[in-house]
């Protein structure tokens, strides 16, 4: 207990009570003034910061690679699919493979390209280009070369 409280308890006089009441009323008035807002205030809100769309040049360079491959067996199809998953375009030359294995690779890569939202196009005899969704193929060159018709496989 502080000395002022003890003093007030034992030696309380009417003048001191009146002074205490006056200071209490003054504190209450000051608090009301602080709580009452002025009638009109100009309130300005900070502008919302918009997020800028900035693409690093490094990122653009990384996503625009073309990989040239010449697989010899069907087991290399998964490696080709990994390039596509890495957002790289792939040109595949299947001329050194048997026709049966080449058809299997094209079927596998067609499914892979479909799954990633890309595209596959024939660009030459037994040559295909597979692209992920970030690469667009424009134009067609199939009419420019004389393709040998393979009578055994009608799909190609």
From Swiss-Prot:
Pfam families: SepF (PF04472). Residues 23-48 are annotated as: Disordered. One of its GO terms (biological process) is division septum assembly. One of its GO terms (cellular component) is cytoplasm. Residues 37-48 have a biased composition (Polar residues). InterPro entries: Cell_div_SepF, Cell_div_SepF/SepF-rel, SepF-like_sf. Residues 23-36 have a biased composition (Basic and acidic residues). The gene is sepF. Cell division protein that is part of the divisome complex and is recruited early to the Z-ring. Probably stimulates Z-ring formation, perhaps through the cross-linking of FtsZ protofilaments. Its function overlaps with FtsA. Homodimer. Interacts with FtsZ. Keywords: Cell cycle, Cell division, Cytoplasm, Septation. The keyword Transmembrane helix does not apply. It comes from Bacillus cereus (strain AH187). The keyword Cell inner membrane does not apply. This is Cell division protein SepF. It is found in: Cytoplasm. Belongs to the SepF family.
């Amino acid at each position: 207990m502080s000395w002022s409280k003890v003093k007030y308890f034992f030696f309380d006089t009417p003048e001191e009570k009146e002074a205490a009441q006056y200071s209490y009323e003054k504190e209450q008035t000051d608090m009301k003034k602080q709580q009452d807002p002025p009638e009109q205030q100009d309130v300005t809100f900070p502008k919302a910061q918009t997020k800028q769309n900035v693409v690093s040049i490094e990122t653009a360079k990384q996503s625009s690679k073309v990989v040239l491959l010449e697989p010899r067996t069907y087991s290399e199809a998964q490696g080709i699919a990994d390039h596509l998953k890495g957002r790289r375009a792939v040109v595949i030359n299947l001329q050194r493979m048997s026709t049966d294995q080449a058809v299997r690779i094209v079927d596998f890569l067609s499914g892979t390209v479909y799954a990633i939202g890309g595209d596959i196009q024939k660009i030459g005899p037994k040559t295909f280009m597979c692209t992920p969704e970030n690469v667009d193929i424009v134009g067609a060159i199939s009419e420019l070369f004389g393709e040998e018709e393979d009578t055994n496989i009608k799909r190609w």
